[in-house]
């Protein structure tokens, strides 16, 4: 999974961030986080499409939280599976990409109904698709008027400023 935020930004002190990384089988994302100096715990579900609160509780017990201000839970799964489970998060961030199409908020409403923030990633690919940011945002806001929506490209480092601010100010 590409990251919707960059820990390379100097306003985010990596030593004060920890990540609980969910994946079916691999530790590839966790390894990338650790290479950036971020305390990381890997959770492999070996088939389940989401993390559950008891898994988060166990992971938190394994993390040295001294000096940690922010714990990011990177859940696994698709837009449907992960939305059904509360993990104790303070901010729920949903992410979709322009390559997935405009219909996701209406086809899979639960994530968008419960998200505090929605990231539309891969915005740099929009010229090669028929994706409409305006339609996508309107559909999100028809489900959840309070959701903040940001467009970005994690790969190209476009539009990350408000996302960095979100983490830097928490």
Language-model region placement:
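Short, well-ordered beta-strand core segments
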Residues: 71, 92-94, 116-119
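Canonical P-loop GTPase G-domain recognition
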Residues: 117, 125-170
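Nucleotide-state-sensitive switch-loop elements of NTP-binding domains
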Residues: 1-90, 100-103, 108, 112
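A glycine- and Lys/Arg-enriched "phosphate-lid" helix/loop adjacent to the NTP-binding pocket
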Residues: 100-134
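A short, gly/pro- and small-residue-rich
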Residues: 88-97, 138-140
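Cofactor-binding loop segments of dinucleotide-utilizing enzymes, especially the Rossmann-like FAD-
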Residues: 22, 97, 154
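Short beta->alpha connector loops at strand-helix junctions that form conserved
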Residues: 43-44, 96, 121
């Amino acid at each position: 999974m590409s990251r919707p935020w960059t820990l390379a930004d100097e306003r985010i002190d990596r030593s004060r961030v920890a990540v609980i990384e969910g994946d079916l089988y691999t530790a590839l994302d966790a390894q990338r986080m650790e290479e950036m100096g971020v305390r990381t715990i890997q959770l492999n579900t070996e088939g389940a499409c989401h993390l559950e609160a008891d898994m988060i509780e166990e992971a938190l017990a394994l993390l040295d939280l001294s000096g940690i201000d922010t714990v990011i839970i990177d859940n696994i799964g698709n837009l449907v599976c992960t939305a059904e489970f509360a993990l104790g998060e303070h901010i729920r961030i949903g992410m979709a990409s322009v390559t997935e199409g405009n219909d996701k908020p209406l086809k899979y409403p639960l994530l968008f109904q419960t998200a505090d923030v929605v990231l539309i990633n891969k915005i740099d690919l929009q010229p090669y698709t028929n994706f409409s940011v305006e339609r996508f945002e309107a559909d999100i806001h028809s489900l959840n008027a309070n959701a903040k929506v940001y467009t970005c490209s994690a790969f190209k480092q476009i539009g990350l400023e408000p996302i960095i601010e979100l983490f830097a100010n928490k």
